[in-house]
From Swiss-Prot:
GO function terms (MF aspect): electron transfer activity; protein-disulfide reductase [NAD(P)H] activity
GO biological process: cell redox homeostasis; cytochrome complex assembly
Encoding gene (name): dsbD
Coiled-coil positions: none
Protein name: Thiol:disulfide interchange protein DsbD
């Protein structure tokens, strides 16, 4: 008897295992958002803790966490650092796994005050949830004597709060600026002034005085960076507006034009004269006087340094990152000061001879500044036009460098010229595709022709108008990485398109996640994206054919053959 019971249990377990093995590949194995990201909160007077218990195999996006107080004032919310996650479409993003605890300080809360918390996450298997919004009721809190601050949740690290290059590049830019025609010839004179006209100083003493001079100059630049970044932080949201980004791009372009010699950009001569007189009153050779000289020198901008400095300051203001602002300007000043330190210690023999090459260095920095408007405009015009702008900039730079290199007489420059010409030819490809319509033609040939719907009523109407044909409904959103993978890799496949030739194709773009989108998702009982639904000729969905998560073209084609009604 016991043996029969054991055999029966084993048979039942085996049946469930095989059912799992041969289960429908499109059936959802994902849990609801509240289970994937279990949210909770706890308030103790001024202290509020928000917690997320994140299920294994799931993660939250740091940049998608938003906190909005209602009838309450809260201190700045500092999100902890996450771990880096990278995908093909969105690049690097910071995410949270396992557990997230976010402390929030309530400075003041009236009766009935609330906190709206918005967050969004995905599964590692390629399934993303719509943004979730939770309302946290707040207990009444009396304001203390400290000044309350408005909420300030960090927005996005990689594209908004960082330069399009490492801050260490500021050091190299500073060194490069030192070799422009307005700066390099002045170094021997500055060296003599710093040393106080004394010719018999020890090497250590000369190096110390020059270092102090550079630190004075760096202090001025660092202070400028901190002030500008702090000002930008107060207007962070406004500085991300498309019109502001376009305005900044125009300013950066004008700054680049000044580096090309179209006009001269510098401080008014009267102000420069006052600053120079203040510097001349300081005593060279003494640490205090040398430090003040350096600090004042940081304010005296020559035509060659004004445009790069203005470009860096404007971009720092746009980023709103104070650490980035101060550090970048400090490295920039240090880069400008390194050649001065070498000249002071080793003499003028280290200086290269002046010549037309210094103007070429200045022009090259004009192209560097032109990269900034392209970087900003990408956020407004999109990736395709952004790629075309990068292409135009690359062609212009490599073309200029190739023409400039033709003046060289050395034999090895022929190799450089070939490399520059090849780089220009590679850079022109996106413009070539645009001009001759290659990209547009490819997109027209490969993309499925979806009919867009928005509401439940529009879906029902489309099912009626299908007139007995099977219907496929694709739920899409810009924030869904796997949805973009479906577009690029699966829906573009000829076999998939052939299998869907007699199917009515509908698509609902729920990127906005507004009331209509949420109503549609709720009506269809959809947890997240990507989700693809199949309806028969009578307008009835076949739940077993539903697809959740990404499928490549081969798997999706097999699914269409086996499961499509």
């Amino acid at each position: 008897m016991a043996q029969r019971i054991f055999t029966l249990i084993l048979l039942l377990c085996s049946t469930s295992v095989f059912a799992g093995l041969f289960d429908a590949p499109g059936r959802s194995q994902f849990v609801p958002a509240d289970q994937a990201f279990a949210f909770d909160f706890q308030q103790n007077q001024h202290d509020l803790n928000l917690t997320w218990q994140i299920k294994d195999g799931y993660y939250l996006y740091r940049k998608q966490i938003r906190i909005t107080p209602e009838h309450a004032k809260i201190a700045d919310v500092q999100l902890p650092q996450g771990v880096w996650h990278e995908d093909e479409f969105y690049g690097k993003s910071e995410i949270y796994r396992d557990r997230l605890t976010l402390p929030v300080t309530i400075n003041q809360a009236s009766a009935g005050a609330t906190l709206t918390v918005t967050y969004q996450g995905c599964a590692d298997a390629g399934f993303c949830y719509p943004p979730e919004t939770k309302t946290v009721p707040l207990s009444e809190v009396v304001a203390n004597n400290e000044a309350s601050q408005p909420v300030s949740v960090p927005q996005q690290e990689q594209p908004t709060a960082q330069l399009p290059f490492s801050a260490l590049w500021a050091l190299l830019i500073g060194i490069g600026i030192a070799f422009t025609p307005c700066v390099l010839p002045m170094y021997p004179l500055i060296s003599g002034i710093v040393l106080g006209g004394k010719q018999r100083l020890s090497t250590a003493r000369a190096l110390l005085l020059t270092f102090i001079y550079v630190q004075g100059m760096a202090l001025t630049y660092t202070a400028l960076g901190l002030v500008v970044a702090a000002a930008g932080l107060q207007f962070q949201a406004a500085l991300q507006h498309p019109y502001v980004l376009i305005g900044l791009a125009i300013v950066f372009t004008l700054l680049a034009m000044s580096m090309f010699g179209l006009f001269t950009l510098q401080l008014p001569s009267s102000l420069q004269t006052r600053l120079t007189l203040m510097s001349n009153r300081q005593q060279g050779g003494s640490p205090g006087g040398v430090f003040i000289m350096g600090a004042i020198a940081g304010l005296i901008c020559s035509p060659c340094t004004t445009a790069p400095l203005s470009a860096i300051l404007l971009y720092i203001a746009q980023s709103g990152n104070m650490w980035l602002g101060g550090g970048t300007l400090y490295l920039y000043a240090l880069g400008m000061g390194l050649p001065l330190m070498l000249i002071t210690v080793f003499g003028n023999r280290l200086l290269p001879k002046s010549g037309p090459w210094m103007e070429q260095v200045k022009t090259a920095f004009g192209f560097v500044i032109l990269a900034l408007p392209v970087f900003l405009l990408e956020r407004v015009i999109g990736d395709i036009w952004g790629l075309r702008l990068w292409s135009a900039l690359g062609v212009a730079f490599f073309g200029w460098a190739f023409i400039t290199s033709l003046q060289a007489k050395r034999g090895w420059m022929r190799v450089v010229q070939i490399i520059l010409l090849a780089a220009a030819l590679v850079s022109v490809r996106p413009l070539q595709d645009w001009a001759f319509g290659a990209t547009h033609t490819a997109q027209t040939q490969t993309h499925l022709n979806f009919t867009q719907i928005k509401t439940v009523d529009e879906l029902n109407q489309a099912l009626v108008e299908a007139k007995g044909k099977p219907v496929m409904l694709d739920l899409y959103a810009d924030w869904c990485v796997a949805c973009k993978e479906f577009e690029k890799y699966t829906f573009s496949d000829p076999q998939v398109q052939k299998a869907l030739a007699d199917t009515v194709l509908l698509q609902a773009n729920v990127t906005a996640n507004d009331a209509q989108d949420m109503a549609l998702l709720k009506h269809l009982n959809v947890l997240g994206l990507p989700t693809i639904l199949f309806f028969d000729g009578q307008g009835q969905e076949h739940p077993q054919a539903r697809v959740t998560g990404f499928m490549d073209a081969e798997t999706f084609s097999a699914h269409l053959r086996d499961r499509q009604p």
